[in-house]
């Protein structure tokens, strides 16, 4: 059946966050998705922060439970589902994460339980260190080695990794480049280069990887899977992700951008 509801996009400022949380609490709004830059700022306004959202300090979904406002993170599971969807094995692999912004903690959390080694590199090293500290908390809980996460200077690269992920916004604007050298990955068809950006659907980061002969994936399926999880939180209904849904998203992206 149909659900009698409307999903709207609103541009807000930090001062608007409390009002939005209050509207969820009093039933004027049933559910909310939060995007960068407010995924962390919203936490202090909530009654309860759930699981991954607490570990990552990143909330992207709000809902009401017994007149209390709950915060969830669907990015981590959405990202993992996108890898499963693409038949990408990520357990016991070496991972290189580029960036340390709003969504990066969710990507880090996805790998913490299973990766052999996780390297983080960011232009601002302090941000990478804060991210590592957050990750180390999860590692301690899982009783894994503290050396699982390592920070490397921007521009330097560790040994060949199995998955390289761009979590920065570089690539949103046409012809933007990360200015990182990956020529030693040439003809390595087992390495996955993953860009969280899904519009444009192929950034220069992915184009270059394809030219080198690497596997590539953009963030479109992560976007869909995290949305499915959020929808279930709100409605207890888990929509099917099929070719028609993907086609509708492609159509919407052309209109929106």
Regions found by a protein language model. Name each.
Residues 191-248:
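Rossmann-fold NAD(P)-binding glycine/threonine-rich loop
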Residues 1-86:
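Phosphate/diphosphate ligand-binding glycine-rich loop within oxidoreductases
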Residues 71-73, 83, 88-112, 122-123:
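Glycine-rich adenosine-cofactor-binding loop
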Residues 65, 88-94, 187-189:
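Short helix-loop-beta connector
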Residues 112-117, 211-215:
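Conserved S-adenosyl-L-methionine
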Residues 34-41, 102-103, 169-172, 199:
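Short glycine-rich anion-binding loops that position phosphate/pyrophosphate groups of nucleotides
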Residues 115-138:
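NAD(P)-binding Rossmann-fold cofactor-contacting core
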Residues 143-216:
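Rossmann-like adenosine-cofactor binding region
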């Amino acid at each position: 059946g149909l659900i009698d509801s409307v999903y709207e996009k609103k541009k807000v400022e930090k001062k608007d966050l409390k009002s939005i949380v209050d509207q969820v609490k009093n039933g004027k709004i049933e559910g909310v998705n939060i995007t960068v830059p407010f995924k962390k700022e919203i936490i202090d306004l909530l009654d309860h922060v759930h699981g991954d959202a607490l570990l990552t300090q990143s909330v992207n979904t709000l809902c009401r439970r017994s007149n209390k406002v709950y915060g969830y993170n669907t990015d981590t599971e959405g990202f993992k589902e996108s890898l499963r969807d693409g038949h990408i094995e990520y357990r016991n692999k070496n991972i290189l994460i580029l960036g340390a912004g709003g969504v990066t903690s969710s990507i880090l959390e996805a790998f913490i339980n299973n990766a052999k080694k996780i390297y983080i590199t960011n232009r601002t090293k302090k941000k990478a260190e804060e991210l590592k500290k957050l990750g180390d908390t999860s590692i301690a809980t899982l009783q894994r080695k503290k050396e699982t996460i390592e920070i490397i200077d921007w521009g330097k690269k560790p040994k060949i990794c199995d998955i390289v992920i761009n979590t920065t916004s570089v690539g949103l604007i046409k012809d933007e480049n990360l200015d990182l050298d990956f020529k030693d990955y040439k003809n390595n068809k087992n390495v996955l280069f993953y860009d969280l950006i899904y519009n444009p659907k192929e950034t220069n980061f992915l184009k270059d990887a394809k030219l080198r002969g690497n596997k590539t994936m953009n963030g479109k399926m992560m976007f869909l899977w995290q949305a499915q999880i959020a929808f279930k939180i709100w409605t207890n209904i888990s929509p099917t992700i099929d070719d028609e849904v993907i086609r509708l998203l492609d159509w919407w992206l052309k209109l929106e951008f």
